[in-house]
Amino acid sequence: MASKLSKDSRPTWPRRAIVTAGMPYGNKNLHFGHVGGVFIPADFYARFLRDRIGRENVLFVSGTDCYGSPIMESYRKLHDEQGYEKHISDYVEANHESQAATLAGYDVEPDFFGGSALEPAVHVHEQMTDEIILRLKEQGVLEKRATKQFFDPVAQQFLNGRQVTGRCPIQGCKSEKAYADECDLGHQFEPEELIAPKSALTGETPELRPVDNIYFDLPSYLDFLKGFTKKLEGNETVRSVVVKTLEEWLNPPQLYIQNKFREAFDAIEGELPPHTVTDPEGNKSSFTVTFPSWRERDDAHEVLGAGGVRFRSGKALVPFRLTGNIAWGVPVTDECGCSGLTCWVWPESLWAPVSFTRTALAADEQAGGTRYAAHNWRDWWCDPEAHVYQFIGQDNIYFYGIAQTAMWEALGWNMQQSTLVANYHVLYMGKKASSSSKTPPPPASELLDHYSAEQLRAHFLSLGLGEKPVSFSPKAYDLRETGKNPDGSPLLARDDKRVIDPVLKEGTLLTGVFNRLARSCFYGVAVKDGDPSTVRTGCIPAGEASTEAAEAAEQAALAFEQAMWRTELHRALGVCDAFLRTANKRWSDASKAAKAVQKDDQAAGDALMHQALVDAFLELRVATVLMHGIVPAGCELICEHFDIAPEAFFSWEHVLNSTDALVESLGEKPGTHRVKELPPRFDFFSY
């Protein structure tokens, strides 16, 4: 902490807060990226907010994304190839239960983890979908469009999104997979732009046939989105990857054409809609054609195709599709202007957290209404005193930052725009994680066979994924050859004692530092037969902490709070690391000095030990509050041995106060609050 922080410059927190975590598809269990890149950070933040602004003022919601073509295609393969006989809803529910169990294994505790197609949220979500689509229609921002959809002439059926594969047409995209109208990096495009389409059902090249769908007029919000994005620049709470990604989508509609097609382009340029041409600069291999709007750009596709000119599209706003014709989806009311349609999974997944909020609030109200401070969902999503924090992966910034932002504005409900806490990819062994690679990453649940939840929570939070992609390289799965065994067989890194496991780095802070400080405090005041020391009262010692300890605790709390406000979670952990190590050293030095004096002067030594324990208890208490969201189980165990109710112990109302003040707030006299006795050789953190 380079400069001293002031209590007068603390951040302002919302009155109420929603925390969401990106929803995993219902066709599989969670992979480590889901847990380490989204759910653990969201859980950390939600736990912090509960302590900071009150448990009743925080709702952490997430759930399984039950609908959509990925689920349909996975279910179809399971049904056709492996004879799975249950309904698709049973398939999704089984995966949902596996996801919930995995999250519980990592001590991730949403207030509500539901499913968009599952009870108790399913009918609330259907109602929410109707309300939003009809409201957008009322606002005049929906449009019925006849667009083209892939049709397999061999299978004689329309193909849903994941039943068509090809290459992404967006300029500069490095996606390995593209589907009917989006790639796996989140780029949106028209089906006719997909390069080399192939049916996943038959392997044949599908045809394009016209279908009617409902679209949200996203391009009309270009100026609004430009202004919104401009305001985010320089905002300390917004990660740079969010602003950078939003800006990429706010360009005019453009096509990129390789120079080798210039002659063919020149031959048909007169047939194109209004446009401008920008010649390539330097050694660039393509020139740029810019259009006034997406309509002119789309009209140009047919002309260019007829002229034999191949092209790639630039990122730009296009109408955002709300509906589709797949059977497994949220039904869309015929009042929208089309009949027999379902909602496309991406838009309905954007308002699914609102549906989950409504479901959780209704359940609490029915049970007596004591858990949450307000039971109207608008008090959480539409009130300027409330705020929404959405933890997502970088690939989903377009949907949450572009499409959702514009739709929320279009609704006219005063929907509060979210803070998007977007993380870069978690790499695996230094490379992008892929289930088809030579060393596929393990499922998140399997990691718990090798590491504790707290080791993994601390490690994932240390990676700093808000700043860059970082590799997750657990030694337990490291198959690199690092030498030879005595019998001449290859020695793998996972079995090599010389290889350090990076996952365990943060765990040593818990076992070697945090654990020692906690043990020292509780054992230090424990009543011990035959020990003449006056500090062994079984109670938290009364008295003011030293200036050094009090200032260190205050500065740590303020720095931690600032880091959390900026959603710099790895820096918040870094504050805890530095504070714990300093506190542990302070205790070590002070207790050694006290013991040395006790040998010759029991009273003087006891006075020094008393002060050392006052300092240590203060620093342990503050560290436990700060670390609560990072390693909740161990911190709650420490709280249990303080023998103070968690709602009082973890509340930030007391974090900057002395320990005497906390004890007095309990209605007790300082020096009389008894701690829970610690059994011999007890560890709060041991792995």
Model-derived features with residue positions:
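Basic, alpha-helical terminal appendages of large translation-related enzymes
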Residues: M1-P14, R145-F150, Q163-G186, E192, ...
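Structured secondary-structure scaffolds
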Residues: A2-I53, L59-S62, Q127, K198-V527, ...
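Amphipathic alpha-helix face/heptad-repeat signature
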Residues: V38, E506-V513, L517, A545, ...
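A non-catalytic, amphipathic alpha-helix used as a structural packing/dimerization or gating element
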Residues: F44, D90-A101, E131, L509, ...
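A charged helix-plus-loop insertion that forms the helical arch/lid used to bind
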Residues: S74-A94
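A broadly conserved sequence feature marking short terminus-proximal activation segments
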Residues: S98-Y179, Y221-L222, K226-G234
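Extended, non-catalytic structural segments that build the interaction scaffolds
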Residues: R162-G172, E176, Y477-T482, L491-L509, ...
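Active-site-proximal binding-pocket segments
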Residues: D495-D496, C521-C539, E544-V575, F579-K599, ...
